[in-house]
Amino acid sequence: MSKIEPLPQAECQRLFQEHLYQLDPTQPVPVPSIASSLETAGVCCLRGLVTAAEVTGVRERFRDQFSRDDDRPGVGESQGDVQRNFQKLRVGISPPKPMNSRLVRTIYNPLWDEDLFGMHALFRRMIRVRNALLGAAEDFALTQPEQGLWTAARLQHYPRGGGFMSAHRDELIIDATADRGLDHFQLLLMLSQKGVDYQRGGGFTIRDERFVDTEQFCELGDMVVYDSRSVHGVDTIDPQETLDLETTSGRLVAFVTLYRDLTG
């Protein structure tokens, strides 16, 4: 197997700028341009749909309400559990694929449950973008399961001093959408900023045998879209620090992924 070399910073910056979209929230999502970026680069950034001030408000509420005592085991929950407000800490491998390992805290916060951190308005904005990319109705799977799919609105927290996710492909997402003619992409919202909230690590993709840092030029409130069929992951967050599971320090992002509804 050939060695994966990092893409030089200057090339990362060029790639980022070529696939950065400054958007107006009142205007349609530029779906063809985003699709072209995913085909060309595997990732792009959408800026202007969420403000840094909005993100700061969410982060403050998350910090104030967070308790490690709310952590549940990383496996064993039912889908009914995560279709409510639910927090879990997952550490280790994910059978049957031993190479898929992680240290990440996930906080499910569906739009039909209490808005714990003031995220619901931002989730709705994300869902609008997601549905535009899917070619679906603007409110598709917004407040309840629809056509066998539900929106797993959630935060992911990668703790300082060791949070990570190994390189993988999003096979559950692909499986959930493959027979519906939906494009294969993942959308996340940056609720933290590299160089400010964490110094090392963060999101990456592997493209053309190169390790591409996808977050070093992102800002608070940016939405990142990547091809979920690509190999991607989260490089270890601040490995030079002692692991901190007691606070919200580290990397924080949000997702509105569609999963199959198995509760009916």
Residue map of PLM features:
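Fe(II)/2-oxoglutarate
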Residues: 1-40, 70
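Histidine-centered catalytic micro-motifs
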Residues: 165-172
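Catalytic core of Fe(II)/2-oxoglutarate
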Residues: 183, 194-264
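Short, P/G- and charge-enriched loop/turn segments at secondary-structure junctions
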Residues: 172-177, 242-243
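Cytochrome P450 catalytic domain signature, combining two hallmark sequence patches
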Residues: 63-75
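Short amphipathic
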Residues: 44-50
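Short, conserved beta-strand element in jelly-roll/cupin
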Residues: 155-160, 175-197, 254-258
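Signature of the catalytic double-stranded beta-helix
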Residues: 50, 89-153, 158-159
